[in-house]
Amino acid sequence: MTAFRLILLMCFAEALSMAGFSAVPALLPVLQNTWHLSAWQAGVLGGSYFAGYVVSISWLSSLTDHVDARRVFLLGTALAGLGSLGFYFLAHDLVSACLFQAVTGAGLAGTYMPGLRALTDRIETSLQPRFIAFYTSTFGIGASLSYAFSGWVGTAYGWPAAFCLAGILPLLAGLLVWRLLPAQHPVPHPRLSMFKTQWVALKNAEIRRHVLGYCAHCWELFGFRAWIVALLTYAGTQSELPLSATAIAALVNLFGIPASILGNEAAIRGDRHRHILRVMLASGVLAWLTGFFASTPWLLIAVLPVYFAAIMADSAALTAGLVASTNAQNRGSAMAVYSLGGFGAGFIAPVMVGVLLDLAGGQKSALAWLLACGSLGVWCLVLATHTLWKRFAPSPIT
């Protein structure tokens, strides 16, 4: 298979496998009303997807050091499909919904990084960083399509129908990869315990820097994606929106695709660490600006694409930097640690946003939305400020 066909196949399969990714955020106001959920309970529901990811990623990603990543990807599509179908057939309250969301999140753990591993194992060329950028930016396409289809199907046929569709499409992705992606036998490496290999990877300072950056990135990204529809729904109570909240959310997510690709190009052509630092500072400031405009729909709609582009401008740069700092023997373990940290933050962020909303006056309070949105960028600002302090702090006088 040519490199072009390979990247096309894996990007298409990734987008299909993510059909359930934004289903809960897109339908969160409906689910809150149906099951009478508070903001923090809604945050738990949104975060349970990433809890399933975190529980599964260490094993599934590390497994790609020993078996063909294609096989792990197929397992992931099965979990993603079964989780959403289980939500369709059996979810009836917060606990059951969280359970099936966790299964769906485990499916992402089996598709996203293992899919990237399947790609990088088959493309060892100087173009690899660009292929990585295309693959990681497809995450945004999958998220946008999930928002759009979940919102449209949920509005037209009811929320259960949206989860039914979200369960079918990952199974189709698995079928395509099973039929079209050639199997590959990985080079055998000495078998060490999963935790030992991940600890060895984490002791690498370059890997550790990328993991910390990814934690801050995912805190902001997944907190934003979990609550953007609810934020726009609040804005719509202040003044009429030009489109539905889910349609605007889907369009905003599309801005992340060119931002991720162009951000990686900037990192390749310049200083990667400096690029990531600038992006984190920008997104941290824009997080507070987004919250400030929450009660002014037109200004909010204007700033959201800029903010989301800033969130995504370091995504591919971080991932490509991680891959560049690993070798074939430890890449799976490094990806496991990287994903565990990032998606662990992605699990906590939606919950913390919900807690802040409840504590600061609820989802009808402008102050609550200011604090909630500002909290999304706090770790990017902390990390960037710490890096700048280390770089420019005066040496102690002796």
Regions inferred by a protein language model and the residue ranges of each:
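Extracytoplasmic gate region of multi-pass secondary transporters
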Residues: V24-P25, R208-N253
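Helix-to-loop junctions at the C-terminal end of transmembrane segments
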Residues: S56-D68, A259-R272, L357
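C-terminal ends and interior cores of transmembrane alpha-helices
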Residues: A78-H92, A282-S295
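Conserved MFS/SLC helix-loop-helix module at the cytosolic interface between two early adjacent transmembrane helices
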Residues: V55-A91
